Amino acid sequence: MIKKILTTCFGLFFGFCVFGVGLVAIAILVTYPKLPSLDSLQHYQPKMPLTIYSADGEVIGMYGEQRREFTKIGDFPEVLRNAVIAAEDKRFYRHWGVDVWGVARAAVGNVVSGSVQSGASTITQQVAKNFYLSSEKTFTRKFNEVLLAYKIEQSLSKDKILELYFNQIYLGQRAYGFASAAQIYFNKNVRDLTLAEAAMLAGLPKAPSAYNPIVNPERAKLRQKYILNNMLEEKMITVQQRDQALNEELHYERFVRKIDQSALYVAEMVRRELYEKYGEDAYTQGFKVYTTVRTDHQKAATEALRKALRNFDRGSSYRGAENYIDLSKSEDVEETVSQYLSGLYTVDKMVPAVVLDVTKKKNVVIQLPGGRRVALDRRALGFAARAVDNEKMGEDRIRRGAVIRVKNNGGRWAVVQEPLLQGALVSLDAKTGAVRALVGGYDFHSKTFNRAVQAMRQPGSTFKPFVYSAALSKGMTASTVVNDAPISLPGKGPNGSVWTPKNSDGRYSGYITLRQALTASKNMVSIRILMSIGVGYAQQYIRRFGFRPSELPASLSMALGTGETTPLKVAEAYSVFANGGYRVSSHVIDKIYDRDGRLRAQMQPLVAGQNAPQAIDPRNAYIMYKIMQDVVRVGTARGAAALGRTDIAGKTGTTNDNKDAWFVGFNPDVVTAVYIGFDKPKSMGRAGYGGTIAVPVWVDYMRFALKGKQGKGMKMPEGVVSSNGEYYMKERMVTDPGLMLDNSGIAPQPSRRAKEDDEAAVENEQQGRSDETRQDVQETPVLPSNTDSKQQQLDSLF
């Protein structure tokens, strides 16, 4: 009887086993063919950030969520490979993808608990999960993981599997892969890790947060000890090595990639350009972009601009705290403040700080980055003293939780504030358009708006040289005499009213030459010139410099620079004068490399005298250069003569009510444009002239940029003659008699041809605003618009 029962039980058990094996076999047969392809492993391309470099190899920008440096398995030190294997998969080189003994041990524990509480995932299984599966704990997911692990083992070598694991695994602190983790936790190359450091990092894959040695040092130390004991058990190290590693004091020096702060505006320009081309892939494909800017030029440009903005703001009253954080509910105020300050940047030696307390005497206690506390008395508060607990200032008052800026002056801390005035500086290689320096404002972190390329501003008198160049092309000369006298134009003002423009200084010089008029920036002469040649002709001609129709008003006010454009566009346009009349396109990207170091693209710039189109007659460019040398020598930009160079030319510009101030100066090699103004346009007052606030910025930068470079000046082209100290085109020594110049002191009447040009100009402007790239067939040929010519280069670049 008993025998029969045993036989029956055994039969049932055997039957269930066969049935179970059958089910598993069927599941395998059904699931295995549906497993994903291993292409992503065989052709592994981890997400790697976009890195942007200056021309001299400094990192100026990095974009991407995952910080990773792909490393071949042979470049990881043996001590780290052994530590990871001892921690995660002791039988890695002996199993077929699944550790059967480990699975059995985990299965017993899971059956006892009644749920999936633990696993015995091998490194291969972790690779399968990290690349293809979710992290949910279900038997179905685990089954797929086992099959994938087997498939991976059949297709890849053990070392390749280990390489994938070492580069893909997340290890906390935004570190992906052990090479990145070595930098972030110990600030060293992965090849230089000690045994103790390797064992500490090897403990992170199990639980990056729980075993983070910075946040949880005690738990991390226990994990390190466990791994070292495993290494000893596997005969990877000796007892002496284990004990020495356990006693080694580890120094955690978090790696902070040094990104040059002076070129952030340039880096953002590159980021946008690559994003437009590649979308989100721009941040994951490991592109390395080399730009045309140099860090030393960037630093000089940044300091030159900041110096002027600081000086202007020096007499301003305190505008209030820049932010506020509520500390009333914080359990650990010091930690709360430290965390907040870690996200702020020190700008121009202005350190962010948070107010911790305001005393009865209205002194202030602040916390600096790093946790240091400093007491500020009324002397240290200075101009900000009136803001301390001043209810009239509302949310901007200095109180507990207020975020302010302080600066260390010879050991004493004092409250400071960032200037409200803004500006931009752009410096180009005149022959290629390569950007050598570009600063878009006082501080990129506080305001990312790039005034060099995004701020549409009136260029004021810096626009006049283009009108004068058009006049030379039309038939005038540098010695053409024009009456600098008041003018009144009925119907040319707002709503058809009388327009009565004035010279900026309110003084008039009578009959003067074009050279004298541009040198002194005479508005009346510019208007009379434009009336003579016609607005329509001027518009068409000036488009040769790269301006769009919408930037060229169809009115006489164009002579005074009332159109709106950007500092970069103005600098690019002036390069035509500097390089002998050729049209080049500005660009910041030089080369792009892929993750493997292969050259992906290289800029093919238009070069003056080679492949760049001739925009204007080289003789015209030369004569304009000689005229604008006088602007620097004896005119409105004579402050630029401080450089002591004879090859410099340029033009200042100031708009109505001193809202915008400009100076564009150049020699045959370099063009640099400086713009100064408030983001919300308002008068800068008496200090807001181009010659007083923009020229000093230009001088400070160009003193560095031109250091050690000889001033040769522009070579006189063929067909230019000199007579009585003036320069002329050989065939045009006198003004074209067909041009009507009304030099009376009353409103001059434009010629019939000028009237026709003006009417055409209005029509062209209206149509041009809706179609910037339309090529009008007028009196003068027009080159492709700036956007079109640049796009042609980008097409060749990408």
Curated annotation (Swiss-Prot):
Residues 739-798 are annotated as: Disordered. Keywords: Antibiotic resistance, Carboxypeptidase, Cell inner membrane, Cell membrane, Cell shape, Cell wall biogenesis/degradation, Glycosyltransferase, Hydrolase, Membrane, Multifunctional enzyme, Peptidoglycan synthesis, Protease, Signal-anchor, Transferase, Transmembrane, Transmembrane helix. It catalyses: [GlcNAc-(1->4)-Mur2Ac(oyl-L-Ala-gamma-D-Glu-L-Lys-D-Ala-D-Ala)](n)-di-trans,octa-cis-undecaprenyl diphosphate + beta-D-GlcNAc-(1->4)-Mur2Ac(oyl-L-Ala-gamma-D-Glu-L-Lys-D-Ala-D-Ala)-di-trans,octa-cis-undecaprenyl diphosphate = [GlcNAc-(1->4)-Mur2Ac(oyl-L-Ala-gamma-D-Glu-L-Lys-D-Ala-D-Ala)](n+1)-di-trans,octa-cis-undecaprenyl diphosphate + di-trans,octa-cis-undecaprenyl diphosphate + H(+); Preferential cleavage: (Ac)2-L-Lys-D-Ala-|-D-Ala. Also transpeptidation of peptidyl-alanyl moieties that are N-acyl substituents of D-alanine. The active site is at E88 (proton donor), S461 (acyl-ester intermediate). The gene is mrcA. In the N-terminal section; belongs to the glycosyltransferase 51 family. One of its GO terms (molecular function) is peptidoglycan glycosyltransferase activity. It comes from Neisseria gonorrhoeae. The keyword Hydrolase applies. Residues 2-9 are cytoplasmic. The chain crosses the membrane at residues 10-30. PANTHER family: BINDING PROTEIN TRANSPEPTIDASE, PUTATIVE-RELATED, PENICILLIN-BINDING PROTEIN 1A. This is Penicillin-binding protein 1A. Residues 50-218 are annotated as: Transglycosylase.
